A protein has these predicted regions:
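N-terminal alpha-helical interaction blocks
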Residues: 1-124, 135-137, 331, 345-346, ...
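Hydrophobic transmembrane signal anchors and adjacent membrane-proximal interface regions, especially
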Residues: 3-7, 30-34, 39-43, 65-68, ...
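Hydrophobic, Leu/Ile/Phe/Ala-enriched alpha-helical segments that form helix-helix packing faces
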Residues: 24, 57, 113-120, 129, ...
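Basic, glycine-/proline-tolerant helical and adjacent loop/strand elements
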Residues: 77-231
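Extended low-polarity, hydrophobic cluster-rich segments
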Residues: 178-182, 349, 383-384, 485-491
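Intrinsically disordered, low-complexity regulatory regions
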Residues: 220-475, 481
């Protein structure tokens, strides 16, 4: 028996196809070949093949759906279904999870697998792969294809293809048995990242490649280098490779950035994913799955690599920089952890999406408090800014001194009223930019004598000349300078607010 499964150009099904390849790869009863656009399966002995596949599903793959935990009150060891799974369960029997899905019921698995491989040609065309078949095993539903929603007003598949949204009505009858199997088994994939926030939602990260071999190479590296711990319930990114401790990232983008750091540190030269479909799966009975499609530019990945390999003050952008930036509440006179985690998440998002404008906004002082960090973190932030933004403009590092000095001036003027700092942030045209610089110049003579000793007034002239030079090369280059000014102003504002703040610039 010979079968061919072509690439779907669909993030869920292509990851499922790659997972299916890894499941079958070590079975003795078949030969399987992976190409750029398909997998080719040759079954040598159908009876033995079905037995081997059943054993693989029951004794190995099913375990990837579960967490084993000890009940703190009774001491009983029990199974718990992973929170991100869109698989319904029945009442536990003896502390063991019982899935409603027959494929994952050990007593029903043989029957389902046998039915799937009894496929005969028919008049029905599969909605996902186009294969002609005679009889479905299951309808298209969230358990085998999570992009279908149960909410009637929002029904349809949330997927993008060739720039268009393709919508399917829910519960299609024409799903072929093979697509059902590939889709339902994808939940067992041990090469996917997940992050759960109890009682709220889970994120499931699906890498996307147009080439199945590249997808396989990437996921194989994730497994081989021990980056993921799939026995953990809420997060599966290991703090250190092949250990049980996992990262406690604050959100979607910080999780992805944290993963990239682990991958680059352990699989430096291997194939890496730029494109992701990230499923946001809510808690509760009705699950309207949202999807973010993310493309991480090569330049951003290059910055992560550069920092890891050659960083002078730090080697990890999330772990050693964003994760050590906090929000201090002046009202509470302590760290506001909710705001802190929001800022860490938003910094990660702005960086991964290469959005320096949003990045600078994260560092602005807010009502009732300000963003702060240690001198070591400040040095790391300056190095990141140079690698990520300044160097690509082809301007020497020493030219940053003028921006830093003017940022210090803005911070001193804004100490008791941050309106000037906000005004700089809101500048939208170069004429407004010059106007704010003139306002800064007018305010310098009225500064406290102590502050005057701690600033460099001539830095304004240096900055003006720098901006003129930048604009000659790139018309909108002044915007990058504006954003850098906001970063340094926010930085020195926080330093001044903290004990023993400020410094000669």
């Amino acid at each position: 028996m010979e079968l061919k499964f072509n690439i779907y150009k669909d993030s869920w099904m292509d990851n499922g196809l790659e997972n299916f390849f890894r499941i079958l790869k070590n079975l003795n009863s078949c030969n399987i070949e992976l190409t750029d656009t398909s997998i080719k399966l040759k079954i040598k002995n159908k009876e033995n093949f079905i037995k081997e596949l059943i054993k693989k599903i029951i004794h190995e793959k099913r375990q990837n759906l579960l967490i084993i935990e000890k009940d703190e009150k009774t001491g009983e060891i029990k199974e718990i279904k992973k929170d991100h799974l869109i698989l319904q369960e029945e009442k536990k029997i003896g502390g063991k999870v019982t899935f409603k899905e027959d494929l994952y019921k050990p007593e029903k698995t043989p029957e389902i697998v046998s039915k799937i491989f009894e496929l005969k040609k028919g008049k029905t065309r599969c909605i996902l792969c186009g294969r002609a078949f005679d009889k479905a095993v299951k309808k298209l539903q969230q358990a085998n294809y999570p992009f279908v929603t149960k909410i009637a007003s929002l029904s349809g598949v949330r997927s993008y293809k060739d720039g268009r949204v393709l919508s399917l009505r829910e519960y299609y009858d024409n799903l072929c048995p093979f697509c059902y199997l590939i889709g339902i088994l994808e939940w067992t994939d041990d090469a996917l990242i997940y992050r759960t926030f109890p009682g709220d939602k889970s994120f499931l990260f699906l890498p996307y490649f147009a080439n199945l071999r590249e997808l396989h190479d990437f996921k194989k590296s994730c497994i081989y280098f021990g980056i993921l711990n799939n026995t953990a319930r809420y997060s599966n990114i290991c703090v250190y490779p092949n250990t049980n401790d996992v990262e406690n990232t604050p959100g979607e983008y910080s999780t992805l950035l944290c993963f990239y750091e682990k991958f680059i540190a352990n699989a430096t030269d291997d194939v890496i994913a730029n494109n992701w479909a990230i499923l946001q799966i809510p808690f509760g009975a009705v699950k309207n799955v949202k999807i973010d499609f993310i493309n991480v530019k090569e330049g951003v990945l290059g910055t992560i690599r550069e920092v890891y390999k050659n960083g002078q003050n730090f080697n990890y952008i999330y772990k050693e920089l964003f994760n050590k930036i906090y929000f201090f509440s002046e009202n509470k006179n302590t760290i506001d952890w909710e705001q802190t985690r929001d800022i860490q998440e938003n910094l990660s998002k702005a960086f991964l999406l290469d959005d320096f404008r949003d990045f600078t906004n994260c560092l602005l002082p807010r009502k009732g408090g300000y963003v702060f960090f240690s001198s070591e973190v400040r040095q790391a932030l300056e190095e990141l800014i140079f690698i990520w933004r300044w160097r690509r403009m082809g301007i020497p590092k020493e030219k940053l001194d003028a921006i830093k000095s003017v940022g210090n001036i803005i911070a001193k003027i804004s100490r008791n009223n941050a309106s000037l700092l906000y005004k700089m942030d809101k500048v939208r045209a170069v004429e407004e930019f010059w106007s704010v610089l003139r306002e800064i110049a007018r305010k310098i003579p009225g500064m406290d004598e102590k502050d005057l000793k701690m600033i460099k007034p001539t830095a304004l002239d240096e900055l003006i000349q720098l901006v003129k030079d930048v604009v000659k090369k790139e018309k909108d280059g002044w915007k990058e300078v504006r954003d850098l000014l906001v970063v340094y102003s926010s930085m020195y504002y926080a330093i001044d607010k903290m004990p023993k703040g400020g410094g000669n610039q």
